[in-house]
Amino acid sequence: MLVACQMAFAQSTRNVGDFSSLKVYNKINVTLIGSNESKVETEENDPDIETVNKNGELKIKLSPAKILSGDQVSVKVFYEKLNDIQASQGSSISSSEELDANMLSLTSNEGSKVNLNLDVSKLNIKTNSGGEIKISGTADNQDVVVNSGGKYFGKEVKSQNTKVTANAGGVAEVNVSE
């Protein structure tokens, strides 16, 4: 006798409106996916995952009860255009796709990680308090600030002009052609 079981995991899609700035908190793992619509997809319909879009700035965070539970939370963020990305409080942001933008600001704080492949004209990097940013791709110009144990791994970024400021144990690895 053969018995087949199939588990279905309910996914929840939230239409969050247009945004160009993304801020992620509370150890949430985000996968970025370029799309012709802006939405957030969660593994389940969890009211403890808060998505707030105010004036084009989308914040994704957990309710206090969910933070204390210690559960791992992953979401997919579908975006049309991004020019500002911030990871805070142990969160992570990554994508298997190349992110294209004219200007992009990336920030990683408080043990968070950002791992992206980019094609941008102007890239602003800021990392501190143990935050990590690992980037590959191209950026015509980079402005990098690393503080208080922040790390920027940008050796795989082809750049023409780069300015680096490192303070208080900050580490920056860059590749510059001019």
Give short role names for the model-derived ranges:
Residues M1-E178:
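Intrinsically disordered, low-complexity terminal regions
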